[in-house]
């Protein structure tokens, strides 16, 4: 069994009978949308249409997908029709992300052990000196140091704590929806993807000068809860002006045409040289809003159920002062990202809270913990330059374990299928919390950590005895002694497993 049919066999355990309820004419919950693409134009189209998607890059080998399809049909890749090509790639991207989320959901579902919750604010007074900001502009995003506070704690089974959250990938009857897209440009009967190099872009732009071509975009929308799939293609005809050699060279110098299908954009530098279009403008940018809406409705979901951005939010950048350091230009904004004014007197990242994975490696003979995965935080981040564990904001619709697993993969390549969750610690501040998820590599499995995004300077296995020698994130410095004791105790508890 393979391809999209495989989804249904692996989706049966996901489906539950609960449904969303209406309040007046609107749903009371937003259904999350996951975009299987790192394309900024596609993200922007959705964002300005009121949808902030979770971004999950598929890492699909596009050449291999097309080569395999051509071989199955006994033809060459060039003989595959353009609508078939874009549809195959859109399906492959959606399916790859679906499988990645299945792995996250499975590991979270199999999580065991105890959830220990600390309530530090119950042990301090509102006028505690530690609540005041230190005068440094960076202090507002620096975690308070509770190392000298006797923190009240509660303990409950981890799965019981997750059930109490009332959210998660397997907790909904609908969604999240996963959208895969792929675009190609057809000129003189030949399909073109991204040129990647200036030389290829130059040759293509010269052929496009004064010509007419077609932009095709495949869309595959998949409902994670039910495994249902809807798919379709959009097409638009474009008429180009004459391009001078000067224009071509200057356009290539912008870098814009190198990483877009057909070597041009409607919403960028190239837009002024498109003299006319017939068809859907958003499809030319890489995601047809009308088609995406139609596919959503085919799955029985209202398009407006995906709205999770207010009109004002579409034009506001929420960025507290961090000593003048700003995130990279291409940094991705996800649903759940944002600063919370916490009761502790500081700002914390994650409107749904935040979570990370404390992954430990054990000696194969003794079972003792030898290393943990650590993240050297990017300079632009809160407390940049310090060491902690990979993690971040919990996205809409995720529970804490799922959020930690997704974030740790995105940041550090901690693959969920290779680890087992054995407990957690939640520091609860009331309106915000951070959950540290304790995990071991599965027996016979290895995790190969690396920096997957711009939020880390480096990711590495660090010997457990050397952790205190690093410049640690405030919360990590405070919690590490108890975390180390718990990791060692968990290793004894799970010895031989």
Residue ranges and their predicted role:
Residues 11, 23-25, 147:
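Serine residues within intrinsically disordered or low-complexity segments
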Residues 30-51:
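N-terminal beta1-alpha1 ligand-phosphate binding loop
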Residues 30-33, 72-315:
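Anionic-ligand binding patches
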Residues 53-62:
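A short beta-strand-loop structural module common to alpha/beta enzyme folds
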Residues 132-133, 313-386, 392-445, 489-497:
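N-terminal leader/linker segments that precede catalytic domains of diphosphate-processing enzymes
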Residues 239-241, 448-489:
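NUDIX/MutT-family hydrolases
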């Amino acid at each position: 069994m393979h391809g999209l049919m495989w989804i249904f066999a692996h989706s049966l355990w996901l489906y539950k009978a609960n449904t969303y309820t209406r309040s007046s004419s609107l749903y009371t919950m937003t259904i999350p949308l996951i975009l299987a693409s790192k394309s900024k134009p596609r993200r922007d189209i959705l964002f300005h249409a009121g949808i902030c998607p979770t971004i999950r890059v598929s890492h699909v080998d596009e050449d291999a997908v097309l080569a395999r399809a051509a071989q199955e049909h006994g033809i060459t890749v060039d003989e595959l029709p353009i609508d078939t090509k874009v549809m195959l790639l859109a399906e492959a991207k959606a399916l790859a992300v679906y499988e990645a989320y299945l792995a996250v959901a499975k590991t979270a579902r199999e999580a065991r052990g105890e959830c220990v919750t600390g309530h530090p604010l119950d042990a301090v007074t509102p006028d505690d000196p530690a609540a005041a900001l230190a005068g440094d502009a960076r202090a507002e995003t620096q975690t308070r140091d509770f190392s000298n506070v006797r923190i009240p704690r509660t303990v409950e089974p981890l799965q019981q704590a997750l059930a109490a959250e009332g959210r998660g990938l397997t907790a909904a009857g609908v969604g999240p929806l996963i959208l895969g897209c792929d675009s190609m440009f057809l000129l003189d009967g030949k399909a073109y993807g991204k040129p990647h190099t200036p030389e290829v872009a130059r040759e293509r732009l010269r052929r496009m000068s004064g010509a007419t071509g077609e932009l095709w975009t495949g869309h595959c929308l998949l409902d994670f809860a039910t495994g249902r799939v809807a798919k379709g293609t959009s097409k638009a005809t474009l008429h180009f002006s004459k391009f001078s050699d000067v224009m071509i060279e200057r356009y290539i110098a912008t870098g814009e045409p190198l990483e877009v299908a057909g070597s041009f954009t409607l919403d960028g530098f190239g837009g002024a040289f498109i003299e006319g279009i017939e068809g859907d403008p958003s499809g030319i940018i890489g995601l047809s809003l009308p088609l995406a809406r139609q596919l959503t409705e085919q799955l029985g979901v209202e398009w407006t159920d995906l709205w999770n951005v207010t009109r004002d939010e579409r034009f506001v950048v929420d960025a507290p002062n961090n000593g003048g350091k700003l995130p990279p230009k291409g940094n991705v904004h996800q649903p759940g990202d944002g600063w919370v004014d916490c009761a502790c007197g500081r700002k914390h990242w994650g409107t749904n809270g935040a979570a990370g994975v404390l992954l430990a490696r054990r000696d194969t003979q003794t079972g003792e913990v030898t290393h943990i995965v650590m993240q050297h935080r990017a300079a632009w981040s809160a407390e940049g330059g310090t060491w902690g564990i990979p993690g971040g904001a919990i996205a809409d619709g995720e529970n804490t374990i799922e959020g930690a697993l997704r974030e740790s993969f995105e940041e550090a390549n901690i693959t969920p299928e290779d680890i087992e969750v054995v407990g957690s610690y939640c520091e609860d501040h009331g309106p915000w919390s951070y959950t540290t998820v304790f995990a071991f590599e599965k027996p016979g499995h290895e995790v190969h950590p690396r920096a997957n995004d711009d939020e880390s300077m480096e990711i590495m296995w660090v010997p457990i005895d050397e952790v205190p020698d690093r410049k640690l994130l405030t919360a990590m410095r405070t919690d590490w002694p108890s975390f180390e004791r718990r990791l060692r105790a968990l290793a004894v508890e799970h010895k031989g497993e």
